[in-house]
């Protein structure tokens, strides 16, 4: 029988992602992850989905500290206290790019910006209230406490490679 992984479903505000990153607790570049592959158009479309309330897939993370606390010892000491992103790197990177001023979105999408007439804005162009409103958007997370990078990779591969790209058809139908 396959062991159940027991991922916990949570909703967290976007600000938690920034907090984890700024504290050095967010691991976006695990060995099984690809690099940053989303272009500007895809990033903007994702942000529009997020801001308009379209459900987006949950981000899958591994709470390595929780795994270590439960007796897992297969992580290097420097990595034992991090949240490793198993699935959702492109989404979280896009959010952080916006917050950090590296991605601009149409100004008409936001009510609270420092320049009311700005055609394009990033998180650094929002007022304190505007940034708080954005940062309080909730995102779904699936949180695991897997004991090793190998188990993280297994989940990553099941989520990303077990299906077909849209438009493809299985040959064994």
Annotate each PLM feature:
Residues 2-22, 26-37, 47-173:
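Basic- and aromatic-enriched surface patches that contact anionic nucleotides/nucleic acids
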